[in-house]
Amino acid sequence: MASSSTEGQAAARGRKKSWTGKVVSDSMDKAIIVAVERRVQHPVYKKYFKKTTRLMAHDEKNEAGMGDLVKVVECRPLSKRKSCRLVEIVEKAK
């Protein structure tokens, strides 16, 4: 079974989560912090509000900058806080 592909193994394990968010920090080497916003409804008052999650992601080529809109996907833990990696830069900051 040495000829099995890694894509086939990854598909068998299930889909990986992906998020789209804005880069809020790029001061580290090969790492960025991405702020992902989502809308949540209050359980009692039914009003919608925004919640922000800050994800640390691996940026191998240091290509993402502050304010860029990026797509990240989950991966194996790379450090204590970093378990996502940069997939693509959707839109560069102006």
From Swiss-Prot:
Pfam families: Ribosomal_S17 (PF00366)
Alphabetized InterPro entries for the sequence: NA-bd_OB-fold (IPR012340), Ribosomal_uS17 (IPR000266), Ribosomal_uS17_bact/chlr (IPR019984), Ribosomal_uS17_CS (IPR019979)
GO molecular function: rRNA binding; structural constituent of ribosome
Ranges annotated as spanning the membrane: none
Domain of life: Bacteria
The protein's assembly and partners: Part of the 30S ribosomal subunit.
Name used for this protein in its record: Small ribosomal subunit protein uS17
Gene: rpsQ
